Structures are given as C-alpha cells and as structure tokens.
From Swiss-Prot:
Keyword Transmembrane carried by entry: no
GO cellular component terms listed in the entry, alphabetical order: plasma membrane
Protein name (record): 3-demethoxyubiquinol 3-hydroxylase
GO terms for biological process, alphabetical: ubiquinone biosynthetic process
Chain sites annotated for binding Fe cation 1: E60, E90, H93, E174
Role of this protein: Catalyzes the hydroxylation of 2-nonaprenyl-3-methyl-6-methoxy-1,4-benzoquinol during ubiquinone biosynthesis.
Family stated for the protein in its record: Belongs to the COQ7 family.
Record carries keyword Metal-binding: yes
MF terms (GO), sorted A to Z: 3-demethoxyubiquinol 3-hydroxylase activity; metal ion binding
InterPro entries: COQ7_proteobact, Ferritin-like, Ferritin-like_SF, Ubq_synth_Coq7
Cofactor(s) named in the record: Fe cation
Binding-site residues for Fe cation 2, renumbered to this chain: E90, E142, E174, H177
Amino acid sequence: MRHYTGIDRLINSFDQALRSLVPGTTAAQRSNPAEQTQAPLTVSDARHVAGLMRVNHSGEVCAQALYHGQALTAKLPNVRLEMEQAAIEEQDHLAWCEDRLKELDSVPSLLNPVWYSLSFGMGAIAGIAGDKYSLGFVAETERQVSSHLQDHLKQLPTHDERSKRILEQMNQDELHHRDTALNAGGVELPVAVKITMTAISKLMTKTSYYI
C-alpha cells in the first residue's frame, strides 16, 4: 500500500476542492433515486424547489470540505479512512443535487467557494483538536444537515416526487454517517461550538437559496 506524504495529501486536497466546486466534475457511484419518476412543476414551484436544491447542494459542498479538512489532519489512520469514505458517499449527494438543478434550469450557488473554504478550515481544526472531537464534529454536522433536509421535504410541492426521493435518500445517508461517527468514538461538542455551527449554517441556507 502506498504511503502518502503531507505533500501528497495537500495535492489531493486541492484536487478534491476542484471536483467539489466545478460543476460536472463529480459523478455519482449510485443510481439517482429520482430515476423513473416525473415531477411537472409550475414556474413558481420550480423556482422554489431550485432554491431548496441549491441550498442542499451547498450543504453537500460544505460536507465535502469538512471531510477533506478532517482527513488532512486526522491523527489515526482508521479515522482518516472514515473521513475519506464518508466524503466519497457524499459525492453522490453532490451529483444528485447538481442533476436536479440542471433539470430545473438552475445553477449551484456562486458562494460555494466561500462555504468550502470555511468548512475545510473548520474540519482541519477539528482534526487537529483530536479524533474524538473530529468525529463529534461530523456527528453534529450530519445532525444539522438531516434537520435541514427534513424541513425541505416538508416544503416540497406534494407532486415533486423527483426531489423528494433524492432528499429522502440523502437524509438516510446523513443519519447513517452521524451514527457511524458516534459509534467510532465521537463526543458531544461544547454548546458554544454548536451555536457557532448553527449560525454559519443559517447564513449559508439563507444566502444560497437566492445566490
């Protein structure tokens, strides 16, 4: 097995950032759960759904950055592998959201580079703080993402089966990642950290809906 140096991981991180931020460069490994479904929408419904999916796409960009940052600084090899595997699974979400945005004649958020940079930095700091905090950070992030997804599912037009199936599968995966992180030794984060994460998340969701 090849041993990766710090330089190797930095180069890999740069490549991962480009793949997360440049539309069309991420391919899903699993089939899109929205296949074989139809979702005719009015103009206003399509605009609203596009806003929701843009927020979800930005959330997945943040998740990618979080995992990439943690994988770069994680101390234990098994934790680094956990982060890398989770990032691979999250790539499906990124691709599915991007596909849905295309179907709605919309585009990802222009602010994604900002969200990626912030999340990468937070992930790297969490990794430096220690693996139990790094895993706890993952668990809390996935909990918040799941909460957003459940809220968006309630906001979807009742006949938008395509978006519904995508978000339901994403939510299932996020909860699995949360449980995996906790079972691997993740600890509950301090209240101040949770509040900060929530504030950043709210800023991202409000701006990415429009921009």
